[in-house]
Design a protein with these regions (language model features):
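Short intrinsically disordered, low-complexity coil segments enriched in acidic
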Residues: 1-2, 153
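N-terminal helical cap/lid subdomain that shapes the substrate entry/recognition surface
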Residues: 3-108
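A short, structured active-site edge motif that brings together acidic residues
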Residues: 44-45, 144-153
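Short, glycine/charged-enriched secondary-structure capping and boundary segments
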Residues: 22-25, 138-142
């Protein structure tokens, strides 16, 4: 039966990349560079991601039109900014922070495992992430996708 399989499609967030540790690390670096007091940046990452499903539900239910994940992440960042001392930053700084999702680090075995699978199969993503987000993440993390199926597909 596996001889009939031609392609393997993967979820990305949490499966291939470590979003929690990546977001926490980059948020900590961002905060330090903007003189923001130390906070629990792991909790920040979790709080930010916890708003993902409610935001997606608004899109699925028609409360919001199709909205790219970059935009949903930015809207959700605004919701938690005050709690983490970020609300007085310029919009451009928050836009910069929002791009951490484009630079998530892979799990230690992800690239090697995907590369091995790629030798036998077409490998790709299936994600709610917009294609630009997924391409940037792949380039940054060295993820060897053959195809990226993102939200616009």
């Amino acid at each position: 039966m596996m001889g009939d399989v031609k392609a393997l499609i993967f979820d990305v967030f949490g499966t291939v990349v470590d979003w929690r540790t990546s977001v926490a690390r980059m948020a900590r670096e961002f905060a330090k560079s903007h003189s923001i007091p130390e906070a629990d940046w792991v909790q920040f990452a979790c709080d930010w991601r916890d708003l993902y499903q409610p935001a997606m539900e608004k899109v699925r239910s028609g409360g919001l039109p199709f909205t790219k994940l970059d935009t949903l992440h930015r809207m959700n960042l605004d919701k938690i900014a005050k709690k983490y001392g970020l609300s007085n930053l310029p919009e451009e700084a928050l836009d910069e922070l929002n791009l951490v999702w484009h630079r998530l680090s892979p799990w230690p075995d992800s690239v090697e495992g995907l590369t091995m699978l790629k030798s036998r199969f077409i490998i790709g993503t299936h994600s709610n992430g917009n294609i630009a987000l997924m391409v940037n993440m792949a380039k940054n993390a060295g993820l060897p996708w053959d195809v990226i199926l993102g939200a616009e597909v």
